[in-house]
Amino acid sequence: MQTNLLKPKAINVDPLGGHRAKVTLEPFERGFGHTLGNALRRVLLSSMVGYAPTEVTIAGVLHEYSTVDGVQEDVVHIMLNLKGVVFRLHNRDEVTLVLRKEGEGPVKASDIQTPHDVEIINPDHVIAHLAQGGKLDMQIKVEKGRGYVPGSMRRYADEPTKSIGRIVLDASFSPLKRVSYTVESARVEQRTDLDKLVMEIETNGAISPEEAIRASAKILVEQLAVFAQLEGSDLAIFEAPAPRAQHFDPILLRPVDELELTVRSANCLKAENIYYIGDLIQRTETELLKTPNLGRKSLNEIKEVLASRGLTLGARLENWPPQGLDKR
């Protein structure tokens, strides 16, 4: 009796025009077409890395509800049009680009000044229209990311000193526009109960359908690899090993009050459940700056006090907190 599962032997990629393609894989054992097709589709739509504008500064504009003299669209519509520009960054994770245009006519994505390692996929995309004597001067920050990130959820390390006029955008990083799949019947010799997986993939051009399917498969393999590494009895799978006893430097077990920080800094730390020096040194500068009412001045004070004791932020402590430590 045959016990080995069939694996796909034929993989065909048929371009459908634009940035669309049909990917066909066969044969699969019955049921595997839906199992893998659904998993790949979900990963493609949710987990692909892409690029999107995340911040914009427009000369003469203080907020997104403003208008710009000589520009047909208001700022909200300019931002919506800007989200339609497809960027691709090579060997970098973020970049700030400049767009300057004067005179009557459309403002297109091709008017954005780009360095050699930044590519605009749809240069004819219209961002705005200028009237006679109109002028548009803006800076656009483009970042690498994954999924959809609302502007209201994005935090910045320099938020306490955020400049007036910087508009934060909702960012849709996903380069996938549409993914669908169907499962058809396949045949191998005398077997007719097999699956053929047919996927139609459409991207925005920042990534090809072939690259997208490879990247999604790689993500699935990496996520599932941990299950292939399970060893030992069934009991060992579900029982976590007992943590090894670890001795910490006594200074890490002291309360943050002993650092003699200002009342403002000490209260900010306690509000974040940071009671011990060991709790504090595991936080990064970025994490501390997100603490309400704790600004750059307080952060510098904390860093100086820690440095005087030979400590720094961003440390890693295994098995922290130790057993019996009162978390108050």
UniProtKB/Swiss-Prot annotation:
Keywords: DNA-directed RNA polymerase, Nucleotidyltransferase, Transcription, Transferase
Top-rank EC class of the record's enzyme: transferase
GO BP terms, alphabetized: DNA-templated transcription
EC number: 2.7.7.6
Oligomeric and partner information: Homodimer. The RNAP catalytic core consists of 2 alpha, 1 beta, 1 beta' and 1 omega subunit. When a sigma factor is associated with the core the holoenzyme is formed, which can initiate transcription.
Domain notes: The N-terminal domain is essential for RNAP assembly and basal transcription, whereas the C-terminal domain is involved in interaction with transcriptional regulators and with upstream promoter elements.
HAMAP family per the UniProt record, alphabetical: RNApol_bact_RpoA (MF_00059)
Role played: DNA-dependent RNA polymerase catalyzes the transcription of DNA into RNA using the four ribonucleoside triphosphates as substrates.
Protein name: DNA-directed RNA polymerase subunit alpha
Source species of the chain: Leptothrix cholodnii (strain ATCC 51168 / LMG 8142 / SP-6) (Leptothrix discophora (strain SP-6))
Taxonomy of the source species: Bacteria, Pseudomonadati, Pseudomonadota, Betaproteobacteria, Burkholderiales
